[in-house]
């Protein structure tokens, strides 16, 4: 095979056939003659040379073919290698682009997390500002209540002074009248005795009698019974001409009761007002007044057949609440049954105002709604509202904003089961406003709970626990246990403080790693370090007391320096750190 692959020798390839020698030239006559053995040998040699020359030509042709095939094969391999290198370069470029895109996504995720952190900080600041506004509103309400009480006391003093002044004036008028009657009788006796004509003084006396100033009416004025209705008013005598000019022109036969009526309205104002909360932004004084007038008429809550139940409406548009002043105490009590009624597509709360005094209101009229009200006419269920009304309703202020409803309930139910509970939340954000209202099933524990919980320090805030109706007085059966309540208050505070020091709360993260990943100590330390560094991105390092992993349960725990920060840690880690891990679970536990 090697012989065929090797190129033929150039000398053998190019050697022409051997020429016949001159002596060997033969004539045609000689050719016709039989060849000799030498000639035959020579011809055979020539044939062999020609055959060898032909084979060499074929070998050269095959060699050229193989060379061309080999060159074509090497070119194909070069092209294949070139294509393979091109594909590898393309893959390298694609991998570079993919890494660049991943880096861009990481940067975008970092920016997004930074923006979310900024929004969280802004939300925290906003909640702090809202809490400040709530505290300011509470102080303002307290100041308004103080001003109302001061105004009430001032009105009471003024009424007392006017009453005393009127009594003194009546005494002076009575003494003057007696003196004038005695003087007139003396003058009459002197005139009859001296037989003199009427003097100017007597004429002056007679003119006084003509004015009717010092004379009793010819008919006694009937006294109105306390329980008389307007339809039972007795017929009064016609007024003398010239008396009380320009006063009550359309009510000739009605006595002047303006000042006592105003005094009565002022005294009953606290019992005739109702608080309406949760108003929609489009509400105004007119729409609220028209709505309550129509609803009161629909349920049969009006005490008078004519006129409207609403006298005045005051709206605080910023806080979305209003004070609605009713015409009578009974109508205000009937309006309490409208708690939860739909107004402009939103349910509203109907409550007593903070200056409502149940003990004083009990003497002015009914304090509960009429049981015969037709609440079904306005889509309400009898007995559904007013679950937190009554003299034993408790106001709980100063709650930390991160306290959940369950935590507040747990704190309050240490004194007994609750009949009603309502934690006030912001309608837009749903976050707690830091105060709540509750009502115990057993009213005898109301003052005990107030005395025990008031003044307790929760985090950076101090609880304010008192009766919601500041004017409400303890029930008679509660007066004997007030001393016991004060003694138990100190014990409650002590138990609560001890419980806080013995309980250690941590934020626990589960389903982050498996138990097999923690078998190796070196891997355990690496995972703990990574988790701790990741946690410090969202939780301030200065507020962390300890971080550890519980083996073999594969639970990563962070213990804050302050127990009150546990809920903040829980919220931050839930919203940020493991949002990309759908199976991770973050919760608060004790150890």
Curated annotation (Swiss-Prot):
Gene3D superfamilies: 3.30.70.330
Any one Gene Ontology cellular component term annotated for this protein: commitment complex
Swiss-Prot/TrEMBL keywords: mRNA processing, mRNA splicing, Nucleus, Repeat, RNA-binding
Residues forming coiled coils: none
One Pfam family of this chain: RRM_1
BP GO annotations: spliceosomal complex assembly
Compositionally biased spans, kind Basic and acidic residues: 37-79, 157-191
Region of interest (Disordered), residue spans: 1-215
Chief location of this protein within or outside the cell: nucleus
Cited PROSITE patterns: RRM
SUPFAM superfamilies: RNA-binding domain, RBD
Source taxon at top rank: Eukaryota
RRM domain boundaries: 272-355, 392-470
Polar residues bias: start-end ranges: 27-36
Localization per Swiss-Prot or TrEMBL: Nucleus
InterPro entries named among the record's database cross-references: Nucleotide-bd_a/b_plait_sf, RBD_domain_sf, RRM_dom, U2AF_lg
An example molecular function term from Gene Ontology annotations: poly-pyrimidine tract binding
Family: Belongs to the splicing factor SR family.
Record function comment: Necessary for the splicing of pre-mRNA.
Domains as described in the record: N-terminal RS domain has a very strong bias in favor of D over S.
Protein name, UniProt field: Splicing factor U2af large subunit A
Species for this entry: Triticum aestivum
């Amino acid at each position: 095979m090697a012989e065929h692959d090797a190129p033929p020798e150039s000398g053998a390839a190019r050697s022409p056939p051997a020429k016949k020698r001159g002596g060997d030239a033969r004539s045609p006559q000689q050719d016709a003659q039989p060849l000799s053995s030498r000639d035959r040998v020579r011809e055979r040699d020539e044939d062999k040379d020609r055959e060898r020359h032909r084979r060499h030509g074929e070998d050269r042709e095959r060699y050229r073919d193989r060379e061309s095939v080999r060159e074509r094969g090497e070119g194909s391999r070069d092209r294949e290698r070139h294509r393979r290198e091109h594909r590898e370069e393309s893959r390298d470029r694609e991998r570079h682009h993919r890494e660049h895109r991943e880096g861009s996504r990481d940067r975008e995720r970092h920016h997004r997390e930074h923006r979310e952190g900024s929004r969280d900080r802004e939300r925290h600041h906003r909640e702090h500002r809202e809490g400040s506004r709530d505290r300011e509103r509470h102080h303002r309400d307290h100041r308004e209540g103080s001003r109302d009480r001061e105004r009430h006391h001032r009105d009471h003093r003024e009424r007392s002074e006017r009453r005393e002044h009127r009594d003194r004036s009546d005494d002076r008028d009575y003494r003057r009248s007696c003196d004038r009657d005695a003087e007139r009788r003396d003058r009459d006796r002197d005139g009859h005795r001296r037989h003199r004509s009427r003097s100017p003084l007597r004429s002056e006396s007679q003119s006084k009698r003509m004015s009717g100033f010092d004379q009793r009416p010819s008919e006694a004025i009937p006294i109105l019974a306390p329980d008389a209705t307007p339809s039972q008013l007795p017929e009064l005598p016609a007024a003398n001409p010239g008396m009380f000019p320009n006063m009550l022109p359309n009510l000739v036969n009605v006595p002047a009761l303006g000042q006592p009526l105003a005094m009565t309205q002022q005294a009953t104002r606290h019992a005739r007002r109702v608080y309406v909360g949760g108003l929609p932004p489009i509400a105004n004084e007119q729409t609220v007044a028209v709505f309550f007038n129509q609803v009161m008429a629909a349920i049969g809550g009006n005490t008078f057949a004519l006129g409207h139940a609403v006298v005045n409406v005051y709206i605080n548009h910023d806080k979305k609440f209003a004070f609605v002043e009713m015409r009578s105490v009974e109508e205000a009590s009937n309006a309490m049954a409208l708690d939860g009624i739909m107004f402009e597509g939103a349910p509203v709360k109907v409550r007593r105002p903070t200056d409502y005094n149940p003990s004083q209101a009990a003497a002015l009229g009914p304090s509960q709604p009429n049981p015969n009200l037709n609440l079904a006419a306005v889509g309400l269920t009898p007995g559904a509202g007013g679950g937190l009304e009554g003299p034993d309703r408790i106001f709980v202020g100063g709650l930390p904003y991160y306290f959940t409803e369950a935590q507040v309930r747990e704190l309050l139910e240490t004194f007994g089961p609750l009949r009603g509970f309502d934690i006030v939340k912001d309608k837009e954000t749903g976050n707690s406003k830091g105060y709540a209202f509750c009502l115990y099933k057993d009213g005898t524990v109301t003052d005990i709970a107030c005395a025990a919980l008031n003044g307790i320090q929760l985090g950076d805030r101090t609880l304010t626990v008192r009766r919601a109706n500041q004017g409400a007085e303890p029930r008679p059966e509660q007066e004997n246990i007030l001393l016991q309540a004060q003694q138990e208050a100190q014990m409650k505070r002590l138990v609560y403080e001890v419980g806080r020091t013995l309980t250690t709360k941590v934020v626990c993260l589960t389903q982050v790693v498996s138990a097999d990943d923690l078998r190796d100590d070196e891997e355990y330390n690496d995972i703990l370090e990574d988790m701790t560094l990741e946690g410090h991105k969202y939780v301030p390092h200065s507020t962390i007391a300890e971080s550890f992993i519980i083996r073999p349960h594969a639970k990563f725990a962070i213990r804050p320096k302050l127990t009150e920060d546990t809920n903040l840690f829980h919220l931050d880690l839930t919203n940020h750190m493991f949002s990309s891990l759908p199976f991770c679970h973050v919760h608060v536990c004790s150890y």
